[in-house]
């Protein structure tokens, strides 16, 4: 993954994240070699066979984005959209960790649960959001995505287990 800074310089994501402490403005993202990337053997079949698919609460641009950019993955998820649930990693307009909120804003996306819903609306029929964002339910649903409100901040293994049970119980 490569980022282009506001100075027009393209650097590797690790350089941006570690050496520069993600403290520069990003104007573009490029996934090097993505045109020749292929899904791992059997992954497309597994997406089609799975009873549900869960998109973790990770950075939609640099963590989930490269996966969706692999030829065939986004299309497979679109085919299964009704069985796909995403969990928002943006809570109260901020990333719980890392530069996701800044990257979203710098690249012209909204750093909010509605922004995440918009990014995933073609591949996910459901978005799980934190209770902090419960007032955003209607905006999420305006993106054509069912909104599920629960505690998504996994501060303990007990809270993580509750979130897991909630998400696994959706769509069944």
Question: Across the structure, where does each feature detected by a protein language model lie?
Answer:
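Short glycine-rich anion-binding loops that position phosphate/pyrophosphate groups of nucleotides
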Residues: 58-62, 90-92, 133
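Structural motif
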Residues: 51-54, 83, 126
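Active-site glycine-rich loop that binds ribose-phosphate moieties when present
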Residues: 27-47
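Charged helix-capping and loop-helix junction motifs
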Residues: 67-74
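Electropositive, gly/pro-rich neighborhoods at or near active sites that engage anionic ligands
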Residues: 1-31
């Amino acid at each position: 993954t490569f980022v282009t800074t506001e100075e027009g310089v393209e650097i590797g994501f690790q350089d941006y994240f570690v050496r520069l402490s993600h403290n520069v403005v990003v104007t573009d993202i490029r996934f090097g070699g993505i045109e020749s990337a292929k899904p791992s053997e059997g992954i497309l079949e597994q997406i089609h066979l799975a009873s549900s698919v869960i998109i973790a609460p990770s950075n939609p641009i640099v963590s989930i984005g490269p996966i969706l950019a692999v030829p065939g993955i986004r299309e497979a998820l679109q085919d299964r959209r009704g069985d796909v649930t995403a969990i928002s990693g943006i809570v109260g307009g901020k990333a719980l960790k890392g530069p996701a909120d800044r990257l979203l804003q710098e690249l012209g996306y909204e750093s909010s649960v509605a922004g995440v819903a918009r990014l995933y609306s073609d591949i996910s029929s459901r978005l799980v959001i934190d209770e902090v964002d419960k007032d955003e339910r209607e905006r999420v649903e305006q993106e054509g995505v069912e909104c599920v409100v629960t505690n998504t901040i996994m501060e303990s293994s007990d809270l993580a287990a509750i979130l897991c049970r909630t998400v696994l119980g959706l769509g069944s």
